[in-house]
């Protein structure tokens, strides 16, 4: 990936070199590697070579905040040594390393395996009594590896581990108002990475109290005495502090022992107090590294907040920390604003302030590496217990590290995390942007995080400290709003897990190219100017007063000499998806949010087309998403086919690139590579070899540039509905390929083996026509619902046969009665072409099929879906709609030169939504499509870059967010577009033109806005939603049809619908709906029979739900009976009897998915 990032600018390398940009500001920093968040974190965990190189570079630059040990080394160091209770022996671990992986990525996907490598660690067992040392290399289980794209392959499916946003360990000070008086109550909390909390608070009587492990409040002076301070030392430390002196006066305890006992009594009421137990209790809470861990980040936060200089490796609390916390708290209480402390060995004045928990200085990221590390730590601590037990039970002479260690808990912990954790998610592979955004997602949910129900508005809200760190726009709509965010484009994560954003340093009013990465807390100390603050030629601020952001987020004007930093880029504050929206600055934030989210739902089309109006981010997004194939090294293309490209490298040797052809993505879209190079082409490192799904020439291409008119048309585009031209259907402009996967297993059953065969009972030869001799469908066959894909028979229980039947069996060797047909068939609503078949056989050594499975067949069906009524389309500005009508091209409105428009949108969708960016995009799209030439030096063109003064037709343009084309530039360019061959300019500076009605040929009375808009086809396709049921499965208890397409369910006829029919007096229609169309078991089978035989439908019977109601009333001890018209009690049969009777009497079972080919299924 790194090679791809610094590639030489050629039109084919996916960078914005081939786009004509309207940007006024040149970026001082290129967009960083967008997957670094994932890959760098995992590199640290396993200690890869790339991580070692980064550490060396950082150390050379004099950075001290780098982690010098890999994540795995850290946890094995933490757990070592494991000692037995008598401390006579110990087991230590050093030097964890990974061997070569067992299967390649492609093999893992093919076979449903996990892409992993065996983890080994050197274990050393030491016997203290004899001094004997035994060393062995021990296998610690298979460790899942990350692919280059930042994903994991678990059981053959691609998954992503989402980074988690959590509260950082450290010390926090809070101010709350006392309910009864106007007094402010101050409190402090010391929160560790793991271990017990420690809380201090000053109450309304000015008493200082402490809470240990969230239990009862106690006097702080008792706590200090328990830590070994005398009353004199406490007075010495807090000289002149009234609240502490007051607390000390009321405290009658004198010695450390008494204080410890007093604390023990309050923590463990009702237990016998021993001095030793009391001492151990406090030690274990805060001073034992096994039980309490601040982590480096917690120590760093405490050092900074309280002005202490402690080593970052000091991971437990010290008396000094506790005293400093109490001093800070009492100073806050006394309304002081400053306090003395030390930082880096120098005395500093600390600004006293309460903490804002939603500030990004107090929230940190747990990235992949740390999440997996925590999981391995859990597994190792479980293993530690096993090791201790084995040390006591095994013969001390025979013990080796191998006999002590059981790796099962470690393997189970890792497996559990990847398989079931809320943060390990099935990767969104709809298009390259969806995958990239998924990997850059930040979630506040998950273990150790927040829950949806408990999260208030404050946590979800946009905070000034998010600037340049988390995107204020891109977040889901719905219950997770604000809890799930996306990393900003230029942000990175430091070794403590805080998000840093880059700024250009300003020295004496001169903006330099020196770039500093600042965390949110560091940024609070500076004044930052925005990226588009005007500069002179020598990089000084052009104006005397500059708009800056001080702490707190309110902007203000300050003298230019006082500015410390300046933003590196106008798109610094937004995420990748948001920075792909042109004219974002003209859109309302709510609509921009929808636009950013809907780009992720765009389906890759048959032919990808990059936008005429982009933002310059398209290349970065496509290449970093990893779906585009780029050259690792420069050379000459030697050989090209649809599946393989071979390159003769400049440094000698060849390199072969394998392309993926029509693979199924996680979302069922087609994943296909298309070669861009030819044999003999010269290719540089980082240049694009092949396009992936939804990319064109290495640029993101999610939709199509279509000619759009904003006008009402016969009411068909009322309420966001969209009218399309038949041309788009005919030319496959918005067609996409979707691939579904179906699998069937042949297992061992109690009655014998299932068999995959062509020899199926009672199946006509026509249905078997496309099956090969094995009973598996041939590639290329067209299939429809109900067609057999894989023939399979299952043995059936033998029934006792009469003598005559046995004779017939003997004569005709009739075997068909022993098996039933359980073939894999095409489900309802699915159809397409067979594009692939995979067969796995346990006899071929495919041991991974699972127990009892002899054979597995996987069939892939591809279908081309043309655009149709009911499909959902959207622009990039949150302007979405459903297609209501596809008009013949001759009925579409057309321009003066006869060009029919492709899409008609409702103009009323714009003013209320305030996403005006779509109109500007439409105008600029027209300009780009036509080409332009600016004559002379008009005033509006003064700020245009020189290269943007003329362009040929079809030029792709970039208008970066917050730094794009201006309104007057667009109006001017509309007047400068290339004229048609008749010398006409169809659209002038108003952006409107005269349209003609395709049906009558008459012009419409008013001019209409027309231009090119980039339109996406979203994954909400009508083919996936449309659904019909005749008969199908029923619920076990109520015997009513199930609901939903997945269950092949029916339509719910609810309470309000019943009222509607009652209001109309439609009694018979209502009776049918409530009985034979729902849960009258016998009645519905009789109706089915009557329809088949063409007879009249009989009277309905008693619905099952009525019987359920009676049973419920009987369970409440109410004696309920049903009486017939003549007063006789009616006996109600059990459900099972009813179902059985219906099947027995009528020989029909209507609850199967497909009408069975054999009557024996009943």
Curated annotation (Swiss-Prot):
Where does it sit, as one GO cellular component term?
DNA-directed RNA polymerase complex
Keywords from the UniProt entry: DNA-directed RNA polymerase, Nucleotidyltransferase, Transcription, Transferase
Identify the Pfam families for this entry.
Answer: RNA_pol_Rpb2_1, RNA_pol_Rpb2_2, RNA_pol_Rpb2_3, RNA_pol_Rpb2_45, RNA_pol_Rpb2_6, RNA_pol_Rpb2_7
- What GO terms describe the biological role, i.e. biological process, of this protein? DNA-templated transcription
Query: What catalytic activity does the UniProt entry give for this protein?
Result: RNA(n) + a ribonucleoside 5'-triphosphate = RNA(n+1) + diphosphate
- PROSITE patterns, alphabetized: RNA_POL_BETA
SUPFAM superfamilies the record matches: beta and beta-prime subunits of DNA dependent RNA-polymerase
One GO term in the molecular function aspect is: DNA-directed RNA polymerase activity
InterPro entries on file: DNA-dir_RNA_pol_bsu_ext_1_sf, DNA-dir_RNA_pol_bsu_external_1, DNA-dir_RNA_pol_su2, DNA-dir_RNAP_su2_dom, DNA-dir_RNAP_su2_hyb_sf, RNA_pol_bsu_bac, RNA_pol_bsu_CS, RNA_pol_bsu_protrusion
On subunit structure and binding partners, the annotation says: The RNAP catalytic core consists of 2 alpha, 1 beta, 1 beta' and 1 omega subunit. When a sigma factor is associated with the core the holoenzyme is formed, which can initiate transcription.
Output the HAMAP family linked to this UniProt entry: RNApol_bact_RpoB
Q: Which family does it belong to?
A: Belongs to the RNA polymerase beta chain family.
Q: What does this protein do?
A: DNA-dependent RNA polymerase catalyzes the transcription of DNA into RNA using the four ribonucleoside triphosphates as substrates.
Q: What is this protein called?
A: DNA-directed RNA polymerase subunit beta
